[in-house]
Regions:
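Short, positively charged and aromatic/hydrophobic N-terminal segments
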Residues: 6-16
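N-terminal type II signal-anchor transmembrane helix
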Residues: 21-61, 65
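Helix-enriched interaction subdomains in cytosolic or periplasmic regions
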Residues: 24-43, 271-301
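Cleft-lining beta-strand/loop regions that shape enzyme active-site pockets
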Residues: 66-186, 315-442
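Charged, glycine-interspersed solvent-exposed loop segments at helix/strand-loop junctions
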Residues: 190-288, 440-520, 524-526, 530-536, ...
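C-terminal long alpha-helix characteristic of the crotonase
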Residues: 245-246, 277-320, 433, 489-495, ...
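Intrinsic disorder and flexible/low-complexity segments
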Residues: 318-321, 325-361, 480, 551-608
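C-terminal soluble interaction/assembly domains
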Residues: 340-346, 351-364, 398-407, 412-414, ...
Length: 608
């Protein structure tokens, strides 16, 4: 009996041993299978991605009877790029580059297969200087004799400003036109910060340097209100004149429409007011498109998008004019560790390296520095100014200002050979400031954290957020700010060939629209990027030339890597979600990453 039990136990144990061997064998096979499957997925996935990108980047020929569709939707970036993550997920973000739009319009003008442009209105987030550049390109397109037709279910004020350039403007029978004038609503967070126990200590130069008001005041100062009023009046004046010229409507009438909120009128009133040429549904517009572009009713209309035009190549002849894009807040070094990415920053150290490389590149005969920035680090601005000075010794440098080139954005290129700005560009703001957060109340009273000190010198703990600056420290800082302001002012004096008194009279942090900046010699000419390129070629004495954009756009692999990390994708999602509140949000978010001394635009206006 005992022997039988032992034999049974042995048999059971032996069976378990066999089962465990089988188990590990099956697990191993499964793991190997998963690895092989993963490799296959990666290989075919990579092949699919390469196929997608290659097809998107392949050179295209425009079909006969094509129409360029200018879809005014999403947010406008200074430079466009392929949304690799969106291509993979089928959820491409609504962002298009100003460079792509301008290039597409220019190519459409010169392409005999493109009959005209169809403007489709949506929700389009763009500043007026960029809109002005697009509008001017559309006006230039019309010089070819080709037509433009515009249609919208609704028109925002900014989109109507663009659409009014069209030969025919149509609206949905149940649509509306938002026409109300321009207002500015600066945001103030002093009381919010006070609730959490934070206050800022500020040292600044310039009565108009109101960038700090957002944190230390609850309303606009008189100088800030004065320059803001002048700024929005300048923009509105341009909008009125442009619409008046295109639609043949008296400026006084347009103001009357805004004051009476014609936005909420019966759509038929828009026709009577000459704001639109007719009320049509989407399917009816197609017939109008064919009629206007000289096509038979049965002829197909081939639609070509702005991004499609990237792959329509033009001949590159002559010498190279480099167009270097610098847009976003100015920082000393790359911002790392952010879930939102940092693609919308001007990194001073990187720009200096790039400009140095352009100076040494014998193929580059002239450089256009395209600036769209409200400023940032005063230190980085000075370093870039110096690099422009070195670049100038070897080849002409022309600055093209976008929506804004103010404070540090003006500083970095004020010594260029020539400066071109749009009439509605925000520029100037010659001044600097320092802001130091005092978090002592948050830390000690709100959170109950106590601090003690051990130090070697009297001011060893200078700049600590755990205590406010004392009067002596503020005095030292003020003298440093004064020196920085004097240097900024001198850079403008030397770059613009003005006297100290002339610059001081227009400095103090004062901002100007491009038209007014021309009068006081802060800029040399009004116009867009195209005009700046032509000027650069002229200064370099080039009869034939082509342009090359710098820095080079990220490769699809770099974009995919960035997309997989989520940073830039989240940044674009945030931009699309917050819209006009994106810039002030990012300013608040990055305050602790910025250098203490700032040369920054005096406000984020939240223009409506």
């Amino acid at each position: 009996m005992t022997l039988l039990i032992k034999l049974s136990i042995f048999a059971f144990s032996n069976q378990n041993i066999i089962s465990m061997k089988d188990f590990f064998k099956y697990v191993g096979a499964t793991v190997v299978g998963l690895i092989v499957f993963g490799l296959i997925v990666v290989i075919f996935g990579t092949m699919s991605i390469v196929g997608l990108i290659s097809s998107a980047q392949a050179t295209q020929n425009v079909s006969k009877n094509s129409v360029l569709v200018l879809n005014l939707s999403g947010s406008l970036a200074e430079q466009g790029s392929d949304d690799v993550w969106g291509m993979l997920t089928g959820n491409e973000l609504g962002s298009v580059g100003l460079d792509d739009i301008l290039s597409a319009i220019k190519k459409a003008k010169n392409n005999d297969r493109i009959k005209g442009i169809y403007i489709e209105s949506g929700i389009f987030l763009a500043n007026y200087a960029s809109r002005q550049e697009i509008r001017n390109a559309l006006l230039d397109f019309k010089k070819s004799g080709k037509k433009i037709i515009a249609y919208g279910d609704n028109y925002t004020q900014g989109n109507y400003y663009l659409a009014s350039v069209a030969d025919k403007v149509f609206l949905n029978p149940q649509g509306m036109i938002d026409w109300h004038g321009i207002g500015a609503q600066p945001m103030f967070v002093k009381d919010l910060l006070k609730k959490v126990g934070i206050q800022y200590q500020v040292v600044k130069v310039g009565k108009y340097k109101s960038a700090t008001e957002m944190y230390i005041a609850d309303k606009m100062s008189d100088p800030s209100r004065e320059q803001t009023q002048a700024y929005i009046d300048g923009i509105w004046s341009d909008v009125l004149k442009a619409v008046s010229d295109s639609r043949k409507i008296n400026v006084d009438k347009l103001n009357q429409y805004a004051d009476s909120l014609i936005t909420f009128s019966n759509p038929k009133d828009y026709v009577d007011a000459k704001l639109v040429d007719g009320l049509l549904y989407t399917n009816q517009v197609k017939d109008e498109v064919k009629k206007m572009f000289g096509l038979d009713k049965d002829d197909p209309v081939n639609q070509v998008g702005v991004t499609d035009m990237r792959s329509v190549k033009e001949e590159s002849e002559g010498k190279q004019v480099a167009v270097y894009y610098a847009y976003g807040s100015i920082v000393d070094n790359p911002v790392t560790g952010s879930m939102f990415g940092a693609e919308h920053m001007i990194v001073g150290s990187e720009v200096c390296k790039d400009l140095e490389a352009l100076a040494e590149d014998d193929d580059v005969k002239a450089v256009v520095l395209r600036i769209n920035s409200g400023g940032g680090s005063a230190y980085a601005s000075e370093q870039m100014w110096n690099q422009v000075e070195q670049l100038k010794k070897k080849k002409p440098v022309v600055v093209s200002m976008g929506d804004m080139a103010a404070s540090g954005g003006y500083y970095m290129g004020c010594n260029a050979n020539w400066i071109v700005a749009q009439p509605t560009t925000l520029t100037g703001s010659i001044g600097i400031f320092a802001m130091i957060p005092d978090m002592s109340q948050l830390l000690t009273q709100k959170l109950g954290i106590k601090f003690d000190e051990v130090k070697t010198n009297k001011n060893s703990t200078f700049g600590s957020s755990a205590r406010p600056l004392n009067a002596e420290e503020i005095g030292y800082l003020a003298r440093y700010i004064d020196r920085g302001y004097a240097l900024f002012r001198q850079r403008v004096v030397d770059g613009r060939k003005l006297s100290v008194n002339q610059v001081e009279a227009i400095a103090q942090g004062h901002v100007f629209v491009g038209r007014d900046a021309l009068k006081i010699k802060l800029v040399d000419e009004l116009g867009g990027l195209e005009k700046a390129v032509e000027k650069a070629a002229k200064l370099a004495k080039l009869d034939e030339f082509y342009t090359q954009d710098y820095p080079a756009k990220a490769s699809w692999m770099d974009q995919l890597t960035g997309a997989m990390s989520g940073g830039n994708y989240l940044d674009e999602q945030l931009r699309a979600t917050l819209g006009e509140y994106y810039e002030p949000f990012m300013l608040l978010k990055t305050m602790n990453q910025q250098s203490m001394i700032q040369a920054r635009i005096p406000f984020y206006l939240n223009i409506r």
